[in-house]
Amino acid sequence: MKNKFSIKVKFPEGILGFEDIKEFIIKDSAHKPFSIMQSINGEINFLVTSPFNFLEKYLPNIENKDWLDIQAENENEKVILCIINMHVKNYKEITANLKAPIILNKKKLIGKQAISTNEEHYLRYRVFKE
């Protein structure tokens, strides 16, 4: 099955823990609403999704400097994704990193991992509530 959606995004600063990787491809996954964020060399893969898929009222406090770093000048250019942590034995244990979202300029295809200063956001937010 061929992926329907695929974009190449530049991360001038890399992402936390992978600062040397500057380009990723974000593409559809067979498991909606998740996407795959894969390094250009194919060695590193992250599962990502919009935090709004499971937390409608997600309001990250992202500094204006972070948006300027990716040249996002208006709301129509801004996209927020979060990295998903999978737990193979129990899907109910899937967590999302709300503390360090991936922010994208969808027009210029530039990204950055930002830090939300909202104290209610956790590194491991449980996606599926009981």
From Swiss-Prot:
GO biological process per UniProt: bacterial-type flagellum assembly; regulation of translation
Keyword Nucleotide-binding included in the entry's annotation: no
GO cellular component terms given for this protein: cytoplasm
Primary localization: cytoplasm
Keyword terms of this UniProt record: Bacterial flagellum biogenesis, Chaperone, Cytoplasm, Translation regulation
Pfam families referenced in this protein's UniProt entry, alphabetically: FliW (PF02623)
Localization of this protein: Cytoplasm
Function description: Acts as an anti-CsrA protein, binds CsrA and prevents it from repressing translation of its target genes, one of which is flagellin. Binds to flagellin and participates in the assembly of the flagellum.
HAMAP family (alphabetical): FliW
Subunit: Interacts with translational regulator CsrA and flagellin(s).
UniProt record similarity statement: Belongs to the FliW family.
Protein name per its UniProtKB record: Flagellar assembly factor FliW
Species per Swiss-Prot/TrEMBL record: Borrelia duttonii (strain Ly)
Origin organism lineage: Bacteria, Pseudomonadati, Spirochaetota, Spirochaetia, Spirochaetales
Gene for this chain: fliW
